[in-house]
Amino acid sequence: MYSIVAEESGLLPRERLLQKGAEVLSDQELLAIVLRTGTRSESVLSMANRILKGMTSLADLSRLSLNELQEIPGIGRVKSIELKAMVELAKRIEKAELARSEQIMSSQQVARRMMLDIGDKPQEHLVAIYLDTQNRIIQQKTVFIGGVRRSIAEPREILYYACHLMATSLIVVHNHPSGEAYPSRNDIDFTQKIKRSCDDLGICLLDHLIVGKSTYYSFREEREDFEL
């Protein structure tokens, strides 16, 4: 269960933010500021406390749909929309921070980016990230949505865009809607096939990443020779 640390200073969250800064506020206080008001029978701090206690971690808030948010007692249509907008804005800020890096330096860097993009999608998304000679992103393209199985026999679409964009290397990423990131036999077969196709064209497959909601698997990191 989510752990709540009580603040006993007597100051309201907005007053504490003004006096001490947002970084010192607890999750409960920050959520109370976003919620703005409670109900006739419950203060906004108490409501924030109750919402957070019903979660295993703060990340759970980002996974709730509008309907699920509205099912929380005290959270109506307006508050659910505001919360959803806040979560989406936080995601976009994180993406913008990651995008500031001019070069892809590690698989972990890409995994963080893609967990935000597709980690919680209900369908499998197959994404190709095309890079130049400096490992800068030329383009990120969603190649397929639905199931990776059909894509296993069709690496040509991935490589078509690589040639069209004059990419020297690429990274392939797909998500597991289950949230788990361990590769299946199909994932391994697909990686072998796309790697061979890349080698034939002189394009470097830097990695194949599988992402879940909060975890990832890197074929390059987990398989030292990346020969499979």
Swiss-Prot record:
Alphabetized GO MF terms: metal ion binding; metallopeptidase activity
Xref: Pfam families: RadC, UPF0758_N
Binding site for Zn(2+): 174, 176, 187
Motif (JAMM motif): 174-187
InterPro entries: MPN, RadC_JAB, RuvA_2-like, UPF0758, UPF0758_CS, UPF0758_N
One GO term of the biological process aspect: proteolysis
Keywords for this protein: Hydrolase, Metal-binding, Metalloprotease, Protease, Zinc
DNA damage keyword on record: no
Protein name stated in the entry: UPF0758 protein stu1465
